Amino acid sequence: MEFFTTSTRNLLKYAAAAGVKHYVALSVVGTERIPESPYLRAKAAQETLIKGGGIPYSIVHATQFFEFVKRIADEATVGTTVRVPAVLFQPMAADDVAKAVGRVAVGAPVNGTVEVAGPQQFRFDDLIRQGLAAYKDPREVVADPHARYFGAELDERSLVPWGEARLGDIRFDEWLGQPALQRR
């Protein structure tokens, strides 16, 4: 929490002093829906500071990145089993996130949130299973309705946009087909 609040206060202070006309921040889809998560509670506090910071702003809520699949699996592993929530998941490529943030940054401030997501929805366990198979990782993947994600139990749609979202172009299978070094 302290990292996000302190860094955001500092950035807002220096942005105001520099005359910044459009403050852009990257956050996470579902931030406001998962208050049990310490990480997402900190992101929500960051967003509150930005909204009250007096600078025109846009907050980009992105879904998780394909590049995080292995790390998510590692964090959810007990023994040789990966336990992930039994929910929908709509991750996107980091390249698409960067493009979306860039488009928002050169546009007019929305003084609100823009949601961006991958072009496909998956069951969380199916996506992790596909990702691990691409890495030739033999761990078993189990959909567990009580598995925690960022410290919280999730609802079916906690990690996907609820309303209209801008969708990335890169599909998960296309991303998996890239050279292994790009998937790190």
Label for each model-derived stretch:
Residues 95-184:
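Mid/C-terminal beta-alpha module of Rossmann-like enzyme folds, strongest
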Residues 1-23, 41-52:
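NAD(P)-cofactor binding segment of oxidoreductase domains
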Residues 57-58, 71-92:
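A conserved pocket-lining segment of Rossmann-fold NAD(P)-dependent short-chain dehydrogenase/reductase
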Residues 60-63, 85, 143-146:
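Conserved beta-strand termini and adjacent loop/short-helix elements that scaffold enzyme active sites
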Residues 41-43, 75-78, 158-160:
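Short, hinge-like loop/turn segments at secondary-structure boundaries
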Residues 1-5, 35-44, 87-95, 118-121:
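Short-chain dehydrogenase/reductase
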Residues 27-33, 45-68, 117:
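Conserved beta-loop-beta element that borders a ligand/cofactor-binding pocket
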